[in-house]
């Protein structure tokens, strides 16, 4: 039997999603340990998209296979009670055997939140990035539109990125201000390592006036990571979740 889970987590205390063995706690390892405890047998999960250390997840989707019979609500509640308080399973649904959390997804969504004021955050320091320079969100939004469509995003991926190629389709990019907080929301078919944070880092330079609006298009065309902006800090980034065709009968928040 195959199940899909919707998982929410605060990534502050984790080295990232992926379980790499030694080196500190991961979200994946914590989830697999809790699921295995409920099943009383080892279980492994496959996720829709891995996140880095300090990055959060609002509705990460995973799937797992098991012969153990449990009600979906029992999987959800039983697993959550065994997880650290920074991770929760929001829902559990049975899915077809050919559903795949990663390969069945048609899009993925991220949001980056940035506090734009002179004084750094205290209460939300783990869920907000910070920029003391005044930023023009309209300039950032206009500049970001140059990235829409299918492009080679080599200028916006990390040097450690192991993807075979840098072509991705960015379906939407919106920059908006809500009081002192600027939000950058993106949706694409897939993302490269550090791609969202590198885009945000470059947009900040445009928003501050240090770089012209046209600079983002020049970076995209030049495909040179070394001349782009710095990688924005991880704490401002949330993986909102993937999107799937409606034939998989998943909750509305992850359905196209």
From Swiss-Prot:
Pfam families xrefs: PseudoU_synth_1 (PF01416)
Alphabetized InterPro entries for the sequence: PsdUridine_synth_cat_dom_sf, PsdUridine_synth_TruA, PsdUridine_synth_TruA_a/b_dom, PsdUridine_synth_TruA_C, TruA/RsuA/RluB/E/F_N
The keyword Isomerase belongs to this UniProt entry's keyword annotation: yes
Top-level taxon in the UniProt lineage: Bacteria
DNA-binding in keyword set: no
Reactions it catalyzes: uridine(38/39/40) in tRNA = pseudouridine(38/39/40) in tRNA
EC number(s) stated in the UniProt entry for this protein: 5.4.99.12
Record-annotated active site: 52
Disulfide bond residue pairs: none
Gene3D superfamilies xref list: Pseudouridine synthase I, catalytic domain, C-terminal subdomain, Pseudouridine synthase I, catalytic domain, N-terminal subdomain
Keywords assigned: Isomerase, tRNA processing
Protein family (similarity comment): Belongs to the tRNA pseudouridine synthase TruA family.
Function: Formation of pseudouridine at positions 38, 39 and 40 in the anticodon stem and loop of transfer RNAs.
UniProt protein name: tRNA pseudouridine synthase A
This protein's encoding gene: truA
């Amino acid at each position: 039997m195959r199940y899909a889970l919707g998982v929410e987590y605060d990534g502050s205390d984790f080295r990232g999603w992926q379980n790499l063995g030694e080196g500190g706690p991961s979200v994946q390892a914590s989830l697999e340990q809790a699921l295995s405890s409920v099943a009383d047998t080892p279980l492994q999960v496959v996720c829709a998209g891995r996140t880095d250390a300090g990055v959060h997840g609002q509705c990460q989707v995973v799937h797992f296979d098991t012969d153990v019979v449990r009600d979906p609500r029992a999987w959800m509640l039983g697993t959550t009670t065994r997880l650290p308080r920074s991770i929760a399973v929001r829902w559990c649904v049975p899915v077809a055997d050919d559903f795949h959390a990663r390969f069945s997804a048609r899009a993925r969504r991220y949001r980056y939140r940035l506090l734009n004021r002179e004084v750094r955050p205290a209460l939300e320091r783990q869920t907000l990035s910070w920029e003391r320079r005044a930023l023009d969100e309209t300039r950032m939004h206009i500049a970001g539109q140059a990235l829409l469509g299918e492009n080679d995003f080599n200028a916006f991926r990390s040097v450690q990125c192991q993807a075979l190629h840098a072509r991705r389709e960015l379906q939407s990019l919106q920059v908006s201000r809500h009081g002192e907080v600027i939000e950058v929301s993106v949706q694409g078919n897939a993302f490269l390592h550090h791609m969202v944070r590198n885009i945000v880092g470059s947009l900040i330079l445009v928003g501050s006036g240090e770089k012209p609006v046209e600079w983002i298009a020049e970076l995209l065309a030049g495909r040179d990571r070394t001349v782009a902006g710095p990688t924005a800090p991880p704490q401002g980034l949330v993986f909102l979740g993937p999107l799937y065709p409606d034939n998989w009968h998943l909750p509305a928040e992850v359905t196209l």
